[in-house]
A protein has these predicted regions:
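Short, well-ordered secondary-structure micro-motifs within conserved domains or adaptor modules
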Residues: 18, 24-81
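Conserved SAM/AdoMet-binding glycine-rich loop
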Residues: 199-209
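Short, charged N-terminal beta->alpha structural module
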Residues: 1-26, 134
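Canonical Radical SAM [4Fe-4S] cluster-binding loop centered on the CxxxCxxC motif
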Residues: 160-193
Length: 209
């Protein structure tokens, strides 16, 4: 299985979503052969096209070009990624738990939408319908956002400040994530030295503050 994307300045979103279904599929810069297994996503002046071909069978989907973003439309990148995702979800029977999310922090999105005045129903629609996020993952993200909210509000009061502490180790990689740094299985030996240094740094910051 190969991934071929054409017609976009960047095919990152399409490539990332295809790998939710075919994790080892390489990206190719040349059109696949006629009988070659592939996912082919394309933007042309006529519209958006997505095709999957595997084991002698194939399926495809088409959509018109989206309206400009300033008129309420989606970006061509997201529209083509979404079209390809829908095709592959039907083709494989797989539903990724985080849906179409790529390179975003879901909890941060909830905070941003609430700060922008969105209703809870609008946020529900944004996650469950636009991104096809599973109910279980969305409810988890909402629970974390609800837990964080009073703490974040206190951080905006006079005489307080927020301190971001980075923990660059993950036991696994979330499907939406594009910035995981250290895999726990591979880099476990670095965890304790990192935490020891982090504790010393936090102590020093407390003394300065």
């Amino acid at each position: 299985m190969k991934i071929y994307i054409t017609g976009l300045p960047s095919g990152y979103e399409v490539e990332h979503l295809v790998r939710l279904f075919y994790p080892m599929a390489p990206l190719t810069l040349t059109p696949p052969e006629n009988a070659e297994d592939c996912v082919w996503a394309e933007k042309t002046p006529d519209g958006l096209h997505a095709l999957v071909r595997q084991d002698g069978r194939s399926a495809e989907r088409h959509a018109p070009l989206p309206a400009p973003v300033e008129q309420g439309g989606e970006t061509p990148e997201f529209s083509l990624a979404s079209l390809t995702y829908d095709l592959l979800r039907d083709w494989t029977g797989i539903r990724p738990p985080w849906g179409k999310m790529t390179g975003v922090r879901p909890v941060r999105l909830i905070h941003d939408k609430r700060a922008a005045g969105w209703t809870e129903a609008e946020i529900d629609h944004f996650f469950l319908d636009r991104f096809d996020c599973s109910q279980q993952k969305y409810q988890m993200a909402k629970a974390i956002a609800d837990l964080q909210e009073p703490i974040l509000k206190v951080g905006n009061e006079p005489g307080t400040y927020s301190l971001y502490i980075g923990i660059p180790f993950c036991p696994s990689r979330c499907s939406y994530c594009s910035f995981v740094s250290c895999n726990l299985d591979r880099d476990r030996k670095l965890v304790q030295p990192y935490v020891d240094c982090l504790c010393r740094e936090v102590e020093a910051i407390r003394e300065e503050a």
